[in-house]
Amino acid sequence: MQNEIKKVCVIGAGVMGSGIAALIANSSHQVVLLDILDKDSNDPNKIVKNSVKNLHKQKLSPLSFPDKVNFITIGNLEHDLDLIKECNLVIEVIVEKLEIKHQLYNKIIPYLKEDAIIASNTSTLPLKKLKVNLPNNIKSRFVITHFFNPPRYMELVELIIDHTIKDEVIEKVSVFLTKMLGKTIIKCNDTPGFIANRVGCFLLELVVHKAIAQNLNFVTIDQIFSRCLGLPNTGIFGLYDLIGHDVMKLISSSLISALPKSDDYHRIYTNTKVFDKMIEHNLIGRKGEGGFYRLSVSNGKKIKEVINISDLSYHPVQKVDISFNSLNELLSSNSIYGKFFSEIITEFYIYLTSLVPSVTNNIYDIDTTMKLGYSWHYGPFELLTIAVKNGWNLIIKNADLMNIPLPKYLASKEYQKIDKQKFNSKKDFLQESKIVLSNDSANLIHYCENLVFVITTKMNSLNHNVFYLLQEAVSKAENYGKNLYIYPQGNNFSAGADLKLILSYIQDGNFHNLENLLKLGQQTMRYLKYSSVHIISCARGVALGGGCELLLNSSYIVANQELNAGLIELGVGLIPGWTGVTEMFARSNGNKTKLIRNIKNIIEQNKTSSADYFKADYGIKNMQVNMNKHYILDDALKLRISKKIVSIPNKITLPKINIVSEIDTSKYNELQNKVLNKFQNIIDKHNEISEAELLTYEREMFLELAKTPQTIEKLQAIVG
């Protein structure tokens, strides 16, 4: 069996199927997208064509860049089955009906490559039922890959396997999902709902049914879940609306039909009359006319409303006073909501622990699933172990009071074996590696025979000490003759300048120190650009303002596909002051089109939505796109780059243009027009300009803007 999946076929061009196809295209892999024949049209591929067109229209774009669509080949299941012969992996994403899936499998089997893998994206059907009628040689190559919607943005994929599947198949799929598509995979047993739906939907149904029965305030419950338990702001009722009441009914009904009568899901999912009535009135959530919440418009303003379950009327959401600041306070309260949450949490953890080991014997996988699949801040085991005082004993005590028998996991005190260190999944390079240089804002470490610079400030913001140590790090790398890697602590490369520091200088009238900070930053960026060794930046998350300037001065970038980067300083009333303006002029070097594009990047605060857009919009030449942010340093260390040819600053040619006549400024504000005029003055005064002159202009403009009340107001609003 070959080790690599080179081409994929996705069958089913609905929202999920087309999203998976787009994800694969984003990784620059060829993908075939097939769906049924449109018999009512002269175009047999109309269904798939419309689906692909829709990829460009969605608010959260499934495509990382428009031309990625060229990796998608379309067809239908009548005329184009031969396209399957070229594919190493076939992902089925069709309706959740077993009979229809079986019909499809029988249809495509004759066209499969000898070692091709079949995967179903089902979220409700068991693996054993999907493959029951398949030939043995196909069964050993059949898995479930449960992607989450939207596939591009949700990191989790549940991989469902059994003992009949070959190890090389599991390895091949796992490598493709993680390295090529950037996913974190959780291997699940073949049980109803796998992990995410079994755990997440149980909690949703438990809370919603119990709250309705007790006539409690939905808004209060959602805010408590968000504040005290670390759930997203949608809470429970908001998430129910987001998923869709019709979809929740489908999932829960499927679970009920598959689970034994003894399973607690049967007990909590009983009285559904209210839900059925809401569905009848198209109150199915965000995609309907409303749900538990809805947005209405009054006098041009959007108003969030909450439903009155008794008559399905709506009224504006009122601000609620939450007196609990922690989960411990909540659970120790004798209030209505204190008692409600004590019952909810007890019932939830009784159910959760009853799933070990049948659903999975790895509790840390459950935590990862809930954090990635449902965006919880804590996994459920992490929450009870770390955030609640004597949490496990509390559950056992409450279970006794509620006369609920303990599952084996609790009765045998398995929770005592929980390793708290495993809840921190981040790889700590500082612990693993030798520190070469260090201060309170950054470290230079020796990792795998390489020099890695790690910023340690909040959001990796930039200040004096970061720049001082970075200059030392460059010198150290040059002395060793080694490339220097800039790697982010946490999920973000750098959010830019320490705005609190900048605001303090402005408020104190200390513009001398502010100018020195600008000079230090500019000097450091020039150190990077003109160093004798390569500066290789590993960028993920955000690289904004000064963080973007770090990238612009690196000789090579390994950027995660989901990178958000850009020169956004104008949003706080400033301009890029650490060579950002200089770089935008230098990178155009006489090219009118490039100069206009680069000026617009600054004026319009262009924050790109992907690494592909950053490469195109900011004219980045030496960049490799990485799909999995967790492997970004590994990918950087594998680069084979020839020895750096050190360049020297040259004069920059400026084309003679009138920027205003080239750019639509009709929607520009006073600040944008002011900065545009400053740039025009530079163009009018010079045919050629040196970097040193541009850097001086850059500092002068920055300091001038820093003294305006508007800038101070913007900075105060952000810093707080």
Swiss-Prot record:
InterPro entries, per database record: 3-OHacyl-CoA_DH_NAD-bd, 3HC_DH_C, 6-PGluconate_DH-like_C_sf, ClpP/crotonase-like_dom_sf, ECH_dom, NAD(P)-bd_dom_sf
Entry keyword annotation includes DNA repair: no
Gene3D superfamilies, sorted: 1.10.1040.50, 2-enoyl-CoA Hydratase, Chain A, domain 1, NAD(P)-binding Rossmann-like Domain
Organism encoding this protein: Rickettsia prowazekii (strain Madrid E)
Entry keyword set: Fatty acid metabolism, Isomerase, Lipid metabolism, Lyase, Multifunctional enzyme, NAD, Oxidoreductase
PANTHER family xref list: 3-HYDROXYACYL-COA DEHYDROGENASE FAMILY PROTEIN (PTHR48075), 3-HYDROXYACYL-COA DEHYDROGENASE-RELATED (PTHR48075:SF7)
Stated family: In the N-terminal section; belongs to the 3-hydroxyacyl-CoA dehydrogenase family.
UniProt cross-references to SUPFAM superfamilies, sorted A to Z: 6-phosphogluconate dehydrogenase C-terminal domain-like, ClpP/crotonase, NAD(P)-binding Rossmann-fold domains
Pfam (any one): ECH_2
Catalyses which reaction(s): a (3S)-3-hydroxyacyl-CoA + NAD(+) = a 3-oxoacyl-CoA + NADH + H(+); a (3S)-3-hydroxyacyl-CoA = a (2E)-enoyl-CoA + H2O; a 4-saturated-(3S)-3-hydroxyacyl-CoA = a (3E)-enoyl-CoA + H2O; a (3Z)-enoyl-CoA = a 4-saturated (2E)-enoyl-CoA
Renumbered residue ranges of the record's region 3-hydroxyacyl-CoA dehydrogenase: 1-384
Chain spans, region Enoyl-CoA hydratase/isomerase: 453-720
Protein name according to UniProt: Putative fatty acid oxidation complex trifunctional enzyme
GO molecular function: 3-hydroxyacyl-CoA dehydrogenase activity; delta(3)-delta(2)-enoyl-CoA isomerase activity; enoyl-CoA hydratase activity; NAD+ binding
Assigned EC number: 1.1.1.35, 4.2.1.17, 5.3.3.8
Record flagged with keyword Glycosyltransferase: no
Gene Ontology biological process terms from the UniProt entry: catabolic process; fatty acid metabolic process
